[in-house]
Curated annotation (Swiss-Prot):
Monomer. Belongs to the PTH family. The keyword RNA-binding applies. The active site is at H19 (proton acceptor). The record marks N9 as: Discriminates between blocked and unblocked aminoacyl-tRNA. Hydrolyzes ribosome-free peptidyl-tRNAs (with 1 or more amino acids incorporated), which drop off the ribosome during protein synthesis, or as a result of ribosome stalling. It comes from Clostridium botulinum (strain Loch Maree / Type A3). Pfam families: Pept_tRNA_hydro. This is Peptidyl-tRNA hydrolase. The gene is pth.
Length: 189
């Protein structure tokens, strides 16, 4: 069983912002596998389904980004999911737009949502899909809560689809295979 967590902030004003990439990827996986994310529990919205023979729980925490660990630990404990089977998808400023990076473990890298998840799980050993949003020329908060330009949006839509495939690959083939397949791929305008 896998817990697939997309990080983001709830509310219409955050829809399609850089910081909500995790929510967008989870929505793509949900659509592909006909999973309705319509239940409220674990301080978030979630739905259950299958990828092949694996049961998956798709979770969108409603705690706001910096408290995402509260939602993740509740769902993980309820379903008794191993940390190695918790996949977290989130935006990453240290990666260029058009790229993603799959990792099996690692530090928070300055991302407060991941930092909070690491604190609650008491571990940094969980797979993640880091989706590049590029470096800001402006205030970081304004940047991550801002929307992509039209040209960037074209690239991001393709990256979101690729990120969903990377999540699915982790479930079906394992983290190493997903890393080999998706790390280093760059989508251009």
């Amino acid at each position: 069983m896998y817990l697939v967590v997309g990080l983001g902030n709830i509310g219409k004003e955050y829809k399609k912002t850089r910081h909500n990439i995790g929510f967008d990827v989870v929505d793509i996986v949900a659509e592909k596998y006909n999973i309705e994310i319509n239940r409220q529990k674990f301080k978030g919205s979630y739905g259950e389904g299958r990828i092949g023979n694996e049961k998956i729980i798709l979770l969108k925490p409603s705690t706001y980004m910096n408290l995402s660990g509260e939602s993740v630990i509740e769902a993980a404990n309820f379903y008794k999911i191993d940390k190695e089977n918790i996949i977290v998808i989130y935006d990453d400023m240290s990666i260029d737009i058009g790229k993603l990076r799959v990792r099996g473990k690692g530090s928070a890298g300055g991302h407060n949502g991941i930092k909070n998840i690491i604190q609650h799980l008491n571990s940094d050993i969980f797979p993640r899909v880091r989706v590049g949003i590029g470096q800001p020329d402006e205030n970081v908060v304004n940047y991550v809560l801002g929307k992509f330009s039209k040209d960037q949006r074209e690239v991001i839509e393709k990256v979101l689809a690729m990120s969903a495939k990377a999540c699915i690959s982790i479930v079906e083939d394992g983290v190493t295979e997903a890393m080999n397949k998706y790390n280093g791929v760059k989508i251009e305008v």
